[in-house]
Structures are given as C-alpha cells and as structure tokens.
UniProtKB/Swiss-Prot annotation:
Residues 27-170 form the SIS domain. It comes from Archaeoglobus fulgidus (strain ATCC 49558 / DSM 4304 / JCM 9628 / NBRC 100126 / VC-16). GO terms for biological process: carbohydrate derivative metabolic process. GO terms for molecular function: carbohydrate derivative binding; isomerase activity. This is Uncharacterized protein AF_1796. Belongs to the SIS family. PHI subfamily. Pfam families: SIS. InterPro entries: PHI/rmpB, SIS_dom, SIS_dom_sf.
Amino acid sequence: MLRFLEVVSEHIKNLRNHIDLETVGEMIKLIDSARSIFVIGAGRSGYIAKAFAMRLMHLGYTVYVVGETVTPRITDQDVLVAISGSGETTSVVNISKKAKDIGSKLVAVTGKRDSSLAKMADVVMVVKGKMKQERDEILSQLAPLGTMFELTAMIFLDALVAEIMMQKHLTEKDLEARHAVLE
C-alpha cells in the first residue's frame, strides 16, 4: 500500500513538473467561449469525465455527459472534452470525430500526443501515466491497467477547476450554491 502511494506521489510530481501552462490557458479559453461543454471517456476515464462535468457545473458552466439520455445535440458553438489514456479508444475517437465534423471544438486529455484523438484535437493536454497497453511488471502489480493515467487525469482536471476558480474569483461557497440538494 505504501509503495502504491509513493508511485502516485511521483506521478503527481511529474505532472506538476511537466504541465504546459500555455495549453492550460488554451483549454480554459475554449471552455469559457463554449455555449455548452460536453465530456466523454470510456470505462474509468468515463468516471473521470463525469467528475469533471460535475465540477464544471458547480462552476456555472452548461455541461453534458455524452451518452446520457438528457444530453442534447452538440453544435459548432460547443466544445467536447475527450479523455482517453491511449487516445485510441474506439468510442471516444469516433464520437470526437463526429463532433469535429459538426464543427465543435475538441480538447483531448490523453497520454499520447501522437494518438488519433490528439491529432484531431484543437487543444491537447498530455497527461503522463502508465496506460493499460504499457507493460511494467512492478508498476502493473501496484497500479494495473490504466490506473496511473486515470488518477493523474483526475488530479489534472481538479487542478484545472481550481485554476478556473481563481481566475473567476469563485469561492467554495459559490460552488456550493450549485451543489445538488436532491440526494
């Protein structure tokens, strides 16, 4: 357990040391200029996308999760945030392509800059973390499959939320006003 926490801590330090602040600014600009924000991810990356969508809603954005029954049509005034460690997840790549064909902006959060998802994106945030296709015997025993990418992506997106809060001078109280009460 302690070894796992050490590995996670190292990945967070790596994220901090390699974060591209210019790309962060571009992401925020796209999010701010969008009529609506749509998020997508498959499997555990999908859970990360949903958590990010919740925080965007708390910040006051209009946000939808792709695949939910109440999700409307995406338009050329919207942005899609797509999360995929490999950048090759079939459903994520196909839906991202469709969004681009419609004229939507695309933000890719991925571990691979040369992936299909990254190549079609308007903004690419590379988040390093072992993907499920990579084999590292020690790391695979501690954090199997895409665990490190998923955790690192979640931390990055929460840091992005904190940055937006600071830029907009929002407080936890502001976010709390939009928090669910029907629980």
